[in-house]
C-alpha cells in the first residue's frame, strides 16, 4: 500500500535580478544541511495559500502581499510522499532573515551555487530557470528556418523547438544543426522534435515530443531537456508522470495553421497553476504580472 501524501505549501520569492530565496535546513530538521524553498506542512483546515504565507513569515520574516499558485506536483521520498503546492510571491514586505537560525541565500535558479538541494524542490528550481518566451520553428527550407529562428531570438525567445515532421531523420538533423549555428550568438536552448538520438546527433539541448509520441513513450528519453505537446488535461498529467520539463498546450490545428503561414509560432509561459510549466500561444497565455520589489533586504 502506498503511503499517504503529505500536503506541503511552498513560497517562491525572487529579487529584482530573478534570484530565488533559499533556506538551509537546520540540524533539528530531517535532511539537515539541504537547501530548499521556504515552506512547510499545511495545517488541518488551512488552505495551501494561507500555509505558504504563514510558513514564509515564520521562516524568513517576509510577509507576502500578493501571490499566485504556480506548480503543484507529488514527489516521492524513500519513506514518504509529499504534494507541493507552490506559490510565486509577486509582492512582499520585510527583510529576509533566518528566524529559525537557518542560513538564507539568494541564488540563480539555473546555477544555485549552494548544495545539496532538497530533491523535492529540483523540479521547481528547474522550472524557474525556463524563459518566458518559446518559439516553434516549422520550415523544411534551412535558410527560411534559420531566419525564422533568428527572428524569434530577436523577439526574446529563450527556447526554440524545431519541427520538421515531414523530413527524413538525416535531413532533420542537418536542419537542426543549421538553426543551432544560426542562433548560437543569442544563446537560446534548442530542442528538436524527434528521437533522443536525433537530438544528440544534432547537438540540440534536448528533444520535443508531439502528443501522440508522448502517449506511446513508456518513460522519459535520455536527454537534458524534454518538452512535450499536450492536447488536454490527461496529456498534461501523463507528461508530468513521465518527467517532462515543460509542455506546450495549444490546439494542434491552430499550431499547424500558424506554422503554415509564417513558419514561426511564439508561445508564452502561462501563469496559471499546473503540474508542470506550460507554454501557450502568446496571444492567449495568461499574462505574467509579477513585479519584483526594488529592495530585497540584507541577509544575515
Predicted features and spans:
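Active-site-adjacent beta->alpha loops and helix N-cap segments on the catalytic face
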Residues: 165-182, 194-201, 206-224, 233-238, ...
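Alpha/beta enzyme core
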Residues: 144-159, 195, 202, 212, ...
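Hydrophobic faces of well-ordered beta-strands that scaffold small-molecule active sites
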Residues: 131-138, 160-162, 190-192, 206-209, ...
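Conserved Nudix-box catalytic region and its N-terminal flanking loop in Nudix hydrolases
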Residues: 19-62, 70-71, 189
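Nudix hydrolase/Nudix homology domain
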Residues: 32, 97-150, 155-157
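Active-site-adjacent beta-strand/loop module that shapes the phosphate/pyrophosphate-binding cleft
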Residues: 73-96, 121
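Conserved N-terminal beta-strand and adjoining loop/helix that marks the start
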Residues: 1-21, 41, 72
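Conserved small-residue-rich
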Residues: 34, 89, 132-197, 204
